[in-house]
Amino acid sequence: MPQPKPSEQEGESMKASQEPAPQPGTDVVPAAPRKPRKFSKLVLLTASKDSAKVAGAKRKGVHCIMSLGVPGPATLAKALLKTHPEAQRAIEATPLEPEQKRSKQNLDSDGPEDNGGSGVSSSSSEETTVLPEAPSTSP
């Protein structure tokens, strides 16, 4: 029985184990492009000299936040609070509930630490907005 040629052996073993590698010069094309991520209704606008465009944007309810750098979440939140006083009132009212729950829990667990923490939080309205940092700063 004659032995098969080396090229035939390679072809048979390649079919059994894997597909042949793409030839040099051919590009691999992705199957489908990704869908763009959806963003909230917050729109960043650039400065425009055309007052008609600005007036049109104001009529549509688009709020402009201008920044020279990459804004962080705190910067965007402050800008939104300045443009939406109703949202500011809603956000300020929301943290009061977790703070009240925390103060009740602290009364049950630790008496001395609660006396220091409750005196500071009741006298300062700014600390209400910085609730996540309050536990990490306590001794």
UniProtKB/Swiss-Prot annotation:
Coiled coil: none annotated. It comes from Mus musculus. Disulfide bonds: none annotated. Residues 98-107 have a biased composition (Basic and acidic residues). Residues 120-130 have a biased composition (Low complexity). This is FLYWCH family member 2. Residues 1-36, 86-139 are annotated as: Disordered.
